[in-house]
């Protein structure tokens, strides 16, 4: 029977991108549908049981600042929390949590179920409904038609997905799930630039057959840092992970069987992630290394499965068993599921607007691995951006443009839509020019007010944020009103040149932890503020002078981002523009001068040609 249901926004896929997209759209007050093959699989962690890390933790904090789900789910499921780069400055520290898969999935499903305006629809999308260059809905395999004003596609690794284990290849979106073939074929009809990428996963081990006594054990932090600004402590029991390493015998077995690897046997055309190489890649690329670390990560408190982080592979199952059992502590281990590589379709993200809407198809948005990224966090951040923008478009409001100067989300989206990808893209702090101001600890200060203005932040977060900002403002005023001479600082045992310069207590906090502690003694009123507020004031003070310089650079970037380039701009008519640059500009169709400036091979003179034409057009429009 043919059924028709009406929604404002339809999200296809219930992975990390899809969950965030659907929830974000619903928080904006539109009616959203999340279409998934199995509702019980919403929020499944398909690969490693962990959230966050360097750069990735920043993305999770930014998602949380806009009232997204991932940070709260990770806090609910976290069984080991570690702040990476703890000995370095806050700008490059990254929160990370080992998660219980079952608890994470349960938390995500609970958040989605509790979200007003969101319906979960079970089914397989086999067709996109299009009308004169606009997405108008989807068709399900059972004949049900879902109409909508915007569609967000978050297909993960399911588009033409193929699983490889040695010479064996089979269709699959992930182990145990069929791929999406009809939808992949439909997308090919849109004439978008398509490619193939691959990712891999290690064998899963039975923790009861591991000799944990041979391993170095790694506990979590004694003072765990949460992902969500609303949470302050773990709720699940905390555990340790084990550390072991490969050895020469391991490497010998892998080398002797490279011809049986799907990757090295020529069965895979897709490019894999550079920063998450398979054990085959590690042994070929780093032939001089005698060992590679392997982190044994329990997948849950009530689950015996262990994820051996560091040995993803596409070798045959029997070879996997041989090399795994050469590793200390794993001599008698039982493999519960072999590792495998998965190859899938992605589409060139340069064919997207900065809102993640497909340039050639109004109302159609892409988010996650379909855009060439890898990682839960990257997918979730894109889902958030796409869901918010789809809802804004439905309501006839201006889109949300994340900037390189305000968020890691902005850095990622700009990288994708301006430069495209040649390999799976993952986030690092090194990708951000303004990383001193784009810290994980201040994501709420950067983004939550934007979320309040948009309408995607709920009352609980809004009230907590406004209370925090009021406390920070009072604390900063308090510190800036206390002026200290070099003599005062000497009494506080803060060494500084006796130059006669009076400094505010806030400026003195920038001298480091000891200075911050001394300032707290000198300004006893600070003790009235909560501990986390005092910590945040110290971090803000530490970077204040550097941020002032970066703000000048950010203002310059924002000026360039404000200069919009029409989508039909005629680059071919610019005399003096090289054929190579003309071709790149026509392909990329940058939305702003800032995006054009970041294209490979772009020159200052070429930018001036474009700016000159834009200014001339602006003057003509004003005169006419």
UniProtKB/Swiss-Prot annotation:
A GO MF term: flavin adenine dinucleotide binding
Binding residues for FAD: 13-18, 125, 180, 369
Organism from which the protein derives: Cereibacter sphaeroides (strain ATCC 17025 / ATH 2.4.3)
Assembly and binders: Homodimer. Heterotetramer of two MnmE and two MnmG subunits.
Domain of life: Bacteria
Keywords of this entry: Cytoplasm, FAD, Flavoprotein, NAD, tRNA processing
Cofactor: FAD
Organism phylogeny: Bacteria, Pseudomonadati, Pseudomonadota, Alphaproteobacteria, Rhodobacterales
Any one of the GO BP annotations: tRNA wobble uridine modification
Name of the protein: tRNA uridine 5-carboxymethylaminomethyl modification enzyme MnmG
Gene: mnmG
């Amino acid at each position: 029977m043919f059924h028709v249901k009406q929604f404002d926004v339809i999200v296809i896929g219930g992975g990390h991108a899809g969950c965030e997209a659907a929830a974000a759209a619903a928080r904006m007050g539109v009616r959203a549908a999340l279409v998934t093959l199995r509702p019980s699989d919403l929020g499944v962690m398909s690969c490693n049981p962990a959230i966050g890390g360097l750069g990735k933790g920043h993305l999770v904090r930014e998602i949380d600042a806009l009232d997204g789900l991932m940070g709260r789910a990770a806090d609910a499921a976290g069984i080991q929390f570690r702040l990476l780069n703890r000995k370095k400055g806050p700008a490059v520290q990254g929160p990370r949590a080992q998660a219980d898969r079952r608890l994470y999935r349960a938390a995500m499903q609970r958040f989605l179920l509790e979200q007003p305006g969101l319906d979960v629809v079970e089914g397989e999308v086999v067709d996109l409904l299009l009308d004169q260059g606009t997405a108008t809905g989807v068709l399900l395999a059972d004949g049900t038609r879902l109409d909508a004003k915007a569609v967000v596609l978050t297909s993960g690794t399911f588009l033409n997905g193929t699983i490889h284990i040695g010479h064996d290849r089979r269709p699959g979106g992930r182990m145990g799930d069929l791929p999406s073939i009809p939808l992949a074929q439909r997308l090919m009809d849109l004439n978008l630039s398509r490619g193939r990428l691959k990712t891999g996963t290690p064998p899963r081990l039975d923790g009861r057959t591991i000799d944990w006594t041979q391993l170095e054990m790694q506990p979590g932090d004694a003072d765990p840092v949460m992902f969500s600004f609303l949470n302050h402590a773990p709720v699940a029991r905390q555990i340790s992970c084990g550390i072991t390493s490969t050895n020469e015998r391991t490497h010998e077995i892998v080398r002797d069987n490279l011809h049986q690897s799907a990757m090295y046997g020529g069965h895979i055309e897709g490019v894999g992630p550079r920063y998450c190489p398979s054990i085959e890649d590690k042994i070929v690329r780093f032939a001089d290394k005698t060992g590679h670390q392997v982190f044994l990560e329990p997948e849950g408190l009530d689950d015996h499965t262990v994820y051996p982080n560091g040995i993803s592979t596409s070798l045959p199952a029997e070879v996997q068993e041989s090399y795994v059992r050469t590793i200390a502590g794993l001599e008698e281990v039982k493999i519960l599921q072999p590792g495998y590589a998965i190859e899938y379709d992605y589409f060139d993200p340069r064919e997207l607007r900065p809102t993640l809407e497909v340039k050639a198809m109004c109302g159609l948005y892409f988010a996650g691995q379909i855009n060439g990224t890898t990682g839960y966090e990257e997918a979730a951040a894109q889902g958030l951006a796409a869901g918010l923008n789809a809802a804004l478009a439905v309501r006839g409001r201006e889109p949300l443009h994340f900037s390189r100067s305000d968020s890691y989300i902005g850095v990622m989206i700009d990288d994708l839509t301006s430069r495209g990808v040649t390999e799976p893209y993952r986030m690092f702090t090194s990708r951000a020019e303004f990383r001193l101001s784009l810290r994980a600890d201040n994501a709420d200060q950067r983004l939550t007010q934007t979320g309040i203005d948009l309408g995607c932040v709920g009352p609980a977060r809004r009230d907590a944020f406004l209370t925090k900002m009021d406390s920070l403002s009072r604390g900063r005023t308090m510190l800036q009103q206390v002026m200290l001479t070099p003599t005062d600082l000497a009494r506080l045992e803060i060494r500084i040149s006796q130059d006669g310069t009076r400094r505010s207590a806030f400026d003195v906090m920038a001298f480091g932890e000891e200075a911050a502690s001394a300032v707290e003694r000198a300004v006893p009123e600070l003790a009235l503020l909560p501990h986390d507020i005092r910590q945040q004031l110290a971090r803000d003070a530490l970077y204040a002078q550097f941020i002032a310089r970066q703000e000048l650079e950010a203002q310059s970037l924002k000026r360039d981002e404000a200069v919009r380039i029409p989508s039909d701009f005629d680059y071919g008519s610019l005399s003096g523009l090289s054929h190579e640059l003309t071709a790149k500009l026509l392909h990329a169709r940058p939305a702003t001068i800032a995006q054009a400036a970041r294209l490979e091979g772009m020159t200052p003179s070429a930018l001036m040609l474009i700016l000159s034409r834009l200014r001339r057009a602006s003057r003509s429009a004003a005169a006419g």
